[in-house]
């Protein structure tokens, strides 16, 4: 509902205050083709691409081939109304073009009720970097720096950090200004995120704008000292932003990991089962955002994300160490999760080096990820606590095969 203009209008028509951007801004940025047009007009750099004419269905195949030839391979077919990786297909060879176009359009129609697809150049070895913006109704707009969200599976984010480990100050400033210009182009109000792809050569290109608070907004709150939920409520109340761009600065480094009920060793397929034990870590610089508790059940009816684990530290190295320890200390039994995979990312030399392009998972686990044999001690301890046994008794029963 957060990105549906009809809902925004319905809230206002009911005499309530809508917390978020206008229906116009939601519509303009919710459609990727109209967003591209608006960004081009505003002077914001976009990824080279081609729209496909909707008024010439008989010539669609020929036009698709011509558009793909102009853009060049490899390319992306993207749903105009898409999001979350749905309605998106990579095409590396012309012979796969028509098949992937049909699949992308079909998935887009099923997911969004709109099968419109356009062609976009695929920027390989790129990074997904996004900028948080905040705008009021008095013409004031600021950015709260960037987040890097390059580590993804199925075009969905797994690990996010702020700030990006590779941006220099000039690029950070230019990207922030571009994000503010993008928001101003649609008279944006409230909190929003402008997403960019950062190419190997350092150029960045507009990807899309999310007209809502995103999953990863806590890491921006950590490094900026700003409560984004409070600020968007203040904006909705008609108040001015309490700070200017010059008042904002980056404070330390923050990392967020998304804890999913899924099996990373089996293509990241969603998993189901009970949350028999759910014991998150705690301590200085650790935050958990979740909507589940011990005893709940992960089911196929909902998104597999169980929680967001966030850490904040004075610098990136300290943040990585804190996150690795937090992932190791997180006790979550009863359903398969990606916690082991997240631990391995935090311990990977490529991640420590900041070598985090969007193909990070495919490059570093080309044959897929496999679960390491775990020390049974923490599981025994958790089981003992759950069932009221002494750790020694639980260990004996587990070793003899009579318990778990």
Where are these regions (language model features)?
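N-terminal beta-alpha lobe that positions the nucleotide/phosphoryl donor
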Residues: 1-194, 198-217
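Catalytic cores of soluble metabolic enzymes centered on carboxylation/carboxyl-transfer
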Residues: 179, 218-404
């Amino acid at each position: 509902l957060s990105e549906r203009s009809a809902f925004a209008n319905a809230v206002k028509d009911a005499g309530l205050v809508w917390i978020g951007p206008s229906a116009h801004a939601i519509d303009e940025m919710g459609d990727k083709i109209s967003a591209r047009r608006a960004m081009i007009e505003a002077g914001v750099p976009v990824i080279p691409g081609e729209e496909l004419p909707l008024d010439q269905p008989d010539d669609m195949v020929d036009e698709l081939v011509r558009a793909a030839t102009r853009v060049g391979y490899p390319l992306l077919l993207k749903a105009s109304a898409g999001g979350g990786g749905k309605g998106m297909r990579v095409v590396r060879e012309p012979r796969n073009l028509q098949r992937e176009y049909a699949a992308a359009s079909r998935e887009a129609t099923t997911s969004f009720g709109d099968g419109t697809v356009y062609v976009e150049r695929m920027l390989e070895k790129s990074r997904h970097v996004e900028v948080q913006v905040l705008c009021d109704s008095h013409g004031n707009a600021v950015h709260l720096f960037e987040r890097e969200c390059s580590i993804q599976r199925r075009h969905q984010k797994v690990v996010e950090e702020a700030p990006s480990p590779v941006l220099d100050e000039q690029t950070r400033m230019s990207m922030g200004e571009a994000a503010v210009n993008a928001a101003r182009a649609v008279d944006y109000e409230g909190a929003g995120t402008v997403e960019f792809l950062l190419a190997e050569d350092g150029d960045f290109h507009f990807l899309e704008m999310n007209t809502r608070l995103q999953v990863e907004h806590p890491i921006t709150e950590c490094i900026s000292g700003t409560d984004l939920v409070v600020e968007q409520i203040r904006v909705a109340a008609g108040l001015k932003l309490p700070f200017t761009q010059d008042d904002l600065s980056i404070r330390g480094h923050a990392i967020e990991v998304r804890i999913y009920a899924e099996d990373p060793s089996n293509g990241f397929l969603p998993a189901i089962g009970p949350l028999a034990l759910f014991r998150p870590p705690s301590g200085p610089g650790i935050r958990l955002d979740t909507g589940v508790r011990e005893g709940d059940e992960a089911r196929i009816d909902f998104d597999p994300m169980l929680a967001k684990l966030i850490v904040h530290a004075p610098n990136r190295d300290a943040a990585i160490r804190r996150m690795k320890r937090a992932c190791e200390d997180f006790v979550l039994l009863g359903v398969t999760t990606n916690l082991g995979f997240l631990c391995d990312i935090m311990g990977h030399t490529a991640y420590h080096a900041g070598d985090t392009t969007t193909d990070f998972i495919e490059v570093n686990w080309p044959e897929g990820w496999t679960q390491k044999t775990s020390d049974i001690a923490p599981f025994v301890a958790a089981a003992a606590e759950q069932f009221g046994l002494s750790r020694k008794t639980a260990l004996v029963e587990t070793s003899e095969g009579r318990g778990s």
